[in-house]
């Protein structure tokens, strides 16, 4: 009986947090846990934090969010999750229960977004993930209807990659063997699982398949083994520090497979700055359209504010998600989280990507593997 009572109290507490009255509020408190240190810091400081800072500045420069007929400024609270899932969960709990934030931004990375998902759901906060890729997105969107998955599924990326590799094989430019490595984190686990099936179904053979722990600095043994496998194609589902190391250490080892597909980081501005001509032809996830005036204007603003360009994959999608959140809040007219979630589920939004309407809490049309873009 006591157990049922405690559960009921917990449910009531979550409901109260979700619908707490905010009449006459003089600020909107937004909080987030983000990887300022640890192996995820590179991705967070390139793709995520600049978008948060730029969007908040732009909204506050207008006087704030339009709520109840007046502009209400945003106040930000942040914690360093240290690239640790347990720390991220504790920080998000603290933001909700102690700091009493009105809204939450998501952390960086697939693993951390999966870790904090139950907390966002428990308290009824919208979770717009734009640095998480998983084939579980459709299932999670049903389990956590407050969650929104902006980067697509692993299968979508693998289907695109397999299509390209199949054409190259048909044209006689590559053989059937693939060497694959993957980081032992949510991103690498999910994508490598989808890749094994996709490659096998398309008649390719994995001549080498190895995972490595997050934080691994010396990847030269894996490069050597991939090189000795004789595979024409090398695929790495890597995080930014690994992507940089793989590019550098492959050059040292004179490893130049006919196709090199690397993970997160290839689209970072520092990648081309660091590797120059050696970056030509390296493939990765995502892409960027030169012909989209809105994303070009976004990139210019990003460069002016941070003295560097945005990530050519998740940044534009992340900024679009913040524009969607802003429009949803202003349409609802108050910080009513259930109503904001409903608007995100059903509304159509004007963003740097163009008009966006989510399907089953997922963005469907903005992901594909691509040759490293030039803007």
Each language-model region and where it sits:
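Extracytoplasmic ligand/sensor domains, especially the bilobed periplasmic-binding protein
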Residues: 50, 101-207, 258-284
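Signal peptide-proximal N-terminal region
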Residues: 50-76, 171-173, 202-203
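Bacterial N-terminal signal peptides that target proteins for export
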Residues: 1-10
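Sec/Tat signal peptide C-region and signal peptidase I cleavage site
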Residues: 19-24
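Extracytoplasmic "Venus flytrap"
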Residues: 31-55, 79-85, 108-109, 181-190, ...
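Segments of small-molecule ligand-sensing domains
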Residues: 304-312, 326-375
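Beta-alpha junction/loop-to-helix N-cap segments that form part of ligand/metal-binding clefts
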Residues: 43-48, 65-139, 150, 212-219, ...
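Extracellular/periplasmic periplasmic-binding protein-like sensory domains
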Residues: 144, 247-319, 330
